[in-house]
């Protein structure tokens, strides 16, 4: 391996620093507080499903966080798999068929069957509501 070349000082003089442009006080209103960035979660939907199935049961913040992570993970897996399926078939659009196939590939046995039937039911319900 060749030895590294010796570093030589730069021949050019460093660029002159320009004075920073001053901000006018009218551009920033001090009375307005900066809003916190909103983090979107599935918490409200998880809670609604919980109340449909077990009306008298609550859920801790830690459990809600775990379920939210689970939903995000499954969503990402299905999206990735359906994207691959669309690419294999040389299509630029992910359709319901790609989603359904991805669900069948990712989820095991009976769980996949139930997920596909619920998904089909949801798509049918949505389609009928948009046509009316």
Curated annotation (Swiss-Prot):
Transmembrane segments: none annotated. The modification N6-acetyllysine is found at residues 7-8, 12, 17. Its main location: nucleus. GO terms for cellular component: nucleosome; nucleus. There is a cross-link at residues 7-8, 17-18 (Glycyl lysine isopeptide (Lys-Gly) (interchain with G-Cter in SUMO)). It is found in: Nucleus; Chromosome. The modification Phosphoserine is found at residue 11. The keyword Phosphoprotein applies. Keywords: Acetylation, Chromosome, DNA-binding, Isopeptide bond, Nucleosome core, Nucleus, Phosphoprotein, Ubl conjugation. InterPro entries: Histone-fold (IPR009072), Histone_H2A/H2B/H3 (IPR007125), Histone_H2B (IPR000558), HISTONE_H2B_site (IPR055333). SUPFAM superfamilies: Histone-fold. Residues 1-39 are annotated as: Disordered. One of its GO terms (molecular function) is DNA binding. There is a cross-link at residue 125 (Glycyl lysine isopeptide (Lys-Gly) (interchain with G-Cter in ubiquitin)). It comes from the Eukaryota. It holds the Pfam family Histone. Residues 1-19 have a biased composition (Basic and acidic residues). Coiled coil: none annotated. The keyword Disulfide bond does not apply. Core component of nucleosome. Nucleosomes wrap and compact DNA into chromatin, limiting DNA accessibility to the cellular machineries which require DNA as a template. Histones thereby play a central role in transcription regulation, DNA repair, DNA replication and chromosomal stability. DNA accessibility is regulated via a complex set of post-translational modifications of histones, also called histone code, and nucleosome remodeling. Belongs to the histone H2B family. The nucleosome is a histone octamer containing two molecules each of H2A, H2B, H3 and H4 assembled in one H3-H4 heterotetramer and two H2A-H2B heterodimers. The octamer wraps approximately 147 bp of DNA. This is Histone H2B.2. The gene is HTB1.
